[in-house]
Each structure stands twice: as C-alpha cells, then as structure tokens.
Amino acid sequence: MVVQNERKEKICCFYVSEFHLEMILVPYINEKINENITILTEKKLRETLEILISKMNLKEDNKEKILKLGWDGEEKIKENSNIIIVGSKEFIKNKNEELENKNVLSVLDCYDFEKEKDGIDNIVKKYKNSLNTLGKNNFWNF
C-alpha cells in the first residue's frame, strides 16, 4: 500500500556557518517543540549547538528537548513529523526522495550557501518559503 504524501510545507534555508544554521533552526524548532521533529544531517552539529543553547534564553525543558534531537547524524524518520535535512545538495535530494511516500508535516532543506551559491537560483525555484534568522518568509511576497 502506498502512503499518500501529506506533506503540507516545503521550506529551504541557506546558512554560512554551523552557528548561523543553528541560530536559524533553534527558534523554528522551539516553536514546534511539542510536535515530532526529525533531523537528518551529514554534519555533526551537537558540539556547536550545545554552546549556542547554553547562551539562549529558552525554557530549560525546551533546551533539553532540542538537545535530544539527532544533531550528530540521521534519526529514524517518524510519521507526521517536521523533517529538517542538513547536508549537500545530493544528500538533500536523496532524503527528499526517501520521504516521497511518508506522511510528514513539513520538510526544511538546509543548504550551505558557500557550496551552493552558484546554483542558488535553481534551488529557490523549488520552494515557496524560506527560513532565515527573521523566521519563515514567502519568497514571492517581496
């Protein structure tokens, strides 16, 4: 039986460093802390995240929940989850293909700006919304 894709939202994000990525992601995750969140990443982000979280003004419970997410690799994909994918363009493409037949609430694809800057126009055409340090924005409302 094929599961109908119930994905409600597809968002992209561009970052210039791991700290920058985490400064974008932590408020987004904090807002969705009571929902399922799955992180699929090629990078080991836990060390920099711990430094950042220790300096942020968040509820202690939320800090703990955020730190328990899979920041050092791939988590098992949970149904009805908000998926965050961090990695190369190829990694992101492969993970999105894996998600095609899964029921997920949203997918946030996070690209390294320096590695993707020459092809950024082609990337953003695939998305309606972006996430940055100001929050979620619609690309086409500028």
Which functions belong to the PLM regions below?
Residues 1-142:
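Non-catalytic regulatory/interaction regions at protein termini and inter-domain linkers
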